[in-house]
Amino acid sequence: MSKSIDILYSSPFPSTRTGALFNAFSYPTKISPEAEAIFIACHSNIGDTILDPFGGSGTTGIATMLTDSPTESMLKKVKELGLEPIWGPRKAVVYELSPVGCLLGRAMCSTKSVIFKKYTETLLKVTSDICNEVYSIVDPEGNIGLLRHAIWSDIVVCPHCGMEIPYAQLAVQDNPLTFKEDSLCPHCGESVHLADAERVKETVNDPLLHREISVKKRRLYKLYGITGKKRWSRYATENDQTSYNSTMANRDITSSPIYPIKWGELYRQGYHYGITHLHHFYTSRNWFVFNTLWSQISQYPEDIRDALKIFLLSYNSAHSTLMTRVVAKKNNPDFVITGAQPGVLYISGLPVEKNILFGLQRKLKTFVEAFEKIESSKGEVQFVNGSSTNVLLEDNSVDYVFTDPPFGDFIPYSEINQLNEAWMGIVTDDAEEAIINPAQGKAI
């Protein structure tokens, strides 16, 4: 064991942020479970108890399972490095303050891939039958297709003539595709510095709060769809916006959670204008679709519900909200669609609305592969949703501690995680959160 430990610390350990176990669920500061498993196998023996008092997304639990079920890449890596790990089952106890982090770890370490695949495919089929109508859209040839994603645009006002203009019309330059900092108003011809251009506000009726609210005015800008096997894109028209408004009017969202956002260090007055509750982070279409998915979970066996929840939440804050973005890459003729910017709650002037059902269908394979990697392991993992200030373990019962301690003021986990935890009905108790955070009144 001492030889392996010497090798492990002689140089930076090679690790990749790839693979099904890593990619199944995005989480701030997440590390490779395969790399951690090698450390555990080199520092402990079969049957030992591993403790992680700051569990995050449950990586230590997954890594402990992997010590009894090492992947081909792990076996290859230890051979290359000349390590002598002791493979075999161990036990892990993982404490995590975040409900979603704890749920994630527990589901990843206890779900059978075949059962998960069966019920997830049913969930997606049932929800598609209900929701595909809201993603239906007319293609450039006049046929009915399905939306893949839509780019929305803030509406700004010209500081010179007072006319309203789509932000995209001013900011986007084609051939090559780039974003401009300054542009000419199409109405008066004066120069507009986009960073200073005032966003237009509008008053709308909030169907969940049952009152009028003031929000940033946004309109559909560009649509990307598929008809049969043919992919296409086109700019949105007034008819598209009218059709969207009509389609989403009076949709049943009575089962939706009504959760007031607990703002802290991440709040920005500009791009968060009008966002007071969870549903304000979504278009009305994606709120309806995600709520429909979530409400279906209670109809499935209890022992698969946690996995279904984690599956949906893996796509939620990263890809289902207005935080989804476009970027312009050199020599690329069109926008590149990406997910939410990690570690913040940023909403751009060109937010993207993805087809949630398409996205989850693609993600299904990743989850199945992740479960397959550890489902044969005889390791045991206990997840405790609570503070590590109160670890209920007997003295001398822990053989090895592997942990990723708090990051000071780097990431306000509880503020970020509430977008997922609100759907669960339980959010992180930030009174116990170890963090430097003026909004919480916490310092060194």
Spans of model-derived segments:
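Conserved SAM-binding loop
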Residues: 406
